[in-house]
Amino acid sequence: MWDIEVSSSDISQKDIEIVCETMKSNWLSMGPKVKEFESMWAKELGINYISAVSSGTAALHLACLCCEFTYGDEVIVPALTFVATANAVKYTGATPIISDIESKDNLILSIEEIRKNITSKTKGIIIVHYAGYTYNIEEISKLAKEYNLYLIEDAAHAITSSYNNKSLGTYGDLACFSFYPNKNITTGEGGVIATNNKDFHEKIRSLRTHGMTTETWNRYNSSISTYDVNNLGYNYRMDDLRASLGISQFKNMKRNKIHRKNLVNKYRELLLGYKEITIPFLTNNTDSSNYIFVIFVKNPILKEKMITDLRNEKIQTSFHYTPLHKFSYYKSKNLLPIVEEVS
């Protein structure tokens, strides 16, 4: 239907061959390929511990469990994000405090909103690196420490992003990445959790596999044949098939980033002359993954005409995102003027 899609998975012949090799190996579940994929990410981020899981949402849920969010707790989240960010908080029984973004130029959780929304019930902050950008991350990290709050980075958009030569995903207590098919690299479904906290890492390893003390691959390669269950865990494992695709995709990740950057520069060059269009992040200093390219069209009639005209040319567009507090489940009368203006 579309000549140009909003996103499409770039699956090469090499990707297919590597996955087929794993299919022939007779080990399909979580095993050596998952371990290899985790090691690649640990080296890439310069972080001590990586755990591969079944999705970015699973990563967020496990991160929230590590922080022991529970009933009566509050966790500050941005209004401009995919719903999984808030859902992961709700899974624990805690309440997501949906907060406004910084500005039309920087679509990131506002540090002033964070300050305003901190209460005696606040236990954590989840910052979303929207479109692969961040803003005030160093100050937000300091603020979290000042108030003894956990900081989780939702880095689903931020594969390869960095700020001040430090990878996004290494500023908080935990960080969650997603490899959904529309992301910069894909495993079909999947994600990883990054942390430097050994206790968190060990808890994640247990929780992702039903709370078991050993994993199938470990038992296969040792004399240990039994296990204990010491947590109420989940089936959040990544399998070796998906990890194999991730390993292959990983090798082209930097080249993909350069290509995206060139496209962003071209789009900006062509669109900056139109007063009806606003382009965010023009002065933002993040070395971005350029996950998505976002524009604002203030006139709603013009916006719909642009969408229709592009559709007629078989060019797909998308809306990222409806603010959380506008969904039926999270409906709120709270006024969040900046995110409401940009949406």
Residue ranges of predicted features:
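Active-site phosphate-binding strand-loop segment of PLP-dependent enzymes
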Residues: 104-187, 192-200
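N-terminal "arm"/small-domain region of PLP-dependent enzymes with the aminotransferase-like
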Residues: 1-28, 32, 228-230
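Short beta-strand->loop structural element characteristic of the AMP-binding/adenylate-forming
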Residues: 95-105, 318
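Phosphate-binding glycine-rich loop
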Residues: 27-74, 88-92, 98-100, 166
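PLP-dependent aminotransferase class I/II
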Residues: 34-39, 47-48, 112, 124-128, ...
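Helix C-cap/helix->beta junction micro-motif
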Residues: 92, 146-147, 313
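Conserved coil-to-alpha-helix start sites within the AMP-binding
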Residues: 81-86
